[in-house]
């Protein structure tokens, strides 16, 4: 009789426990519907996702919620409303994504935001911290037309935003000639018909003649490059003075 009595007591305890869990679930559903209706009446634009998560966590324990639970939820909702009011309307909308164990709130950026601020916020890994909007850098002040000529003379005492243009290479269409020298004409030695022709030169003689010609061509290229650099002498002077000021 003793084992049978223990089995009966165990079944009664399980039945009482199941009834308590059922009562807790029903009571929680009633309070949830009441709070959802109250929230919809007060704040029609907000959802009750947080309330649902809290209710589910309570029902999972199988205990009856306390009598002060609605009061705590109202207090929590009041604190959230105050936080939203202090943070401004921009904190109400969030779109947080998680990528490689780091999170970023994309709702704070617009379609024209560069990629670098988004990467910087992702590296910070703080979705609740908003990226401060930086004012665009001021453009360079326009240079008046009457000051372009005096820019070279006053380069020591003022900032330089524009270098003077190079001098004209010469007549129109000679810009290419200032960089490329004129070709060197080959040396031809004509022989009269009545004189016998010279024998063919040896390879060493040909190499010597070609080396002399190559040297003259290289010297002509050096002279053309030097003449072209002289066109930028004013700009080089300004850059040299800026370097010496440092």
Curated annotation (Swiss-Prot):
Residues 163-172 have a biased composition (Pro residues). There is a cross-link at residues 5, 7 (Glycyl lysine isopeptide (Lys-Gly) (interchain with G-Cter in SUMO2)). GO terms for molecular function: protein-containing complex binding. GO terms for biological process: G0 to G1 transition; gene expression; negative regulation of transcription by RNA polymerase II. Residues 36-90, 127-209 are annotated as: Disordered. Keywords: Acetylation, Isopeptide bond, Phosphoprotein, Ubl conjugation. The modification Phosphoserine is found at residues 135, 138, 182, 202. Residues 36-55 have a biased composition (Basic and acidic residues). The keyword Disulfide bond does not apply. It comes from Bos taurus (Bovine). PANTHER family: LIN37 HOMOLOG, PROTEIN LIN-37 HOMOLOG. One of its GO terms (cellular component) is Myb complex. The modification Phosphothreonine is found at residue 167. The modification N-acetylmethionine is found at residue 1. This is Protein lin-37 homolog. Signal peptide: none annotated. The gene is LIN37. Pfam families: LIN37. Component of the DREAM complex (also named LINC complex) at least composed of E2F4, E2F5, LIN9, LIN37, LIN52, LIN54, MYBL1, MYBL2, RBL1, RBL2, RBBP4, TFDP1 and TFDP2. The complex exists in quiescent cells where it represses cell cycle-dependent genes. It dissociates in S phase when LIN9, LIN37, LIN52 and LIN54 form a subcomplex that binds to MYBL2.
């Amino acid at each position: 009789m003793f084992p049978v009595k223990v089995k009966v007591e165990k079944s009664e305890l399980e039945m009482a426990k199941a009834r308590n869990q059922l009562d807790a679930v029903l009571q929680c559903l009633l309070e949830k519907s009441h709070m959802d209706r109250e929230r919809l009446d007060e704040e029609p634009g907000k959802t009750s996702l947080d309330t649902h998560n809290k209710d589910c966590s309570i029902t999972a324990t199988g205990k009856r919620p306390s009598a002060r639970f609605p009061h705590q939820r109202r207090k929590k909702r009041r604190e959230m409303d105050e936080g939203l009011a202090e943070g401004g309307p921009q904190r109400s909308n969030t779109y947080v994504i998680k990528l490689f164990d780091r999170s970023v709130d994309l709702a704070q950026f617009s379609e024209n935001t560069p990629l670098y601020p988004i990467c910087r916020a992702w590296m910070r890994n703080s979705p609740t911290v908003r990226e401060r909007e930086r004012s665009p850098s001021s453009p360079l002040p326009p240079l008046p037309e009457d000051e372009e000529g005096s820019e070279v003379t006053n380069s020591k005492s003022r900032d330089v935003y524009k270098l003077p243009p190079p001098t004209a290479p010469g007549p129109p269409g000679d810009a290419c000639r200032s960089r490329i020298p004129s070709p060197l004409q080959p040396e031809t030695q004509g022989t009269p018909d009545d004189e016998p022709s010279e024998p063919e030169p040896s390879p060493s003689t040909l190499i010597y003649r070609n080396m002399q010609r190559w040297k003259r061509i290289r010297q002509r290229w050096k002279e053309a490059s030097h003449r072209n650099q002289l066109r930028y002498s004013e700009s080089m002077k300004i850059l040299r003075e800026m370097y010496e000021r440092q």
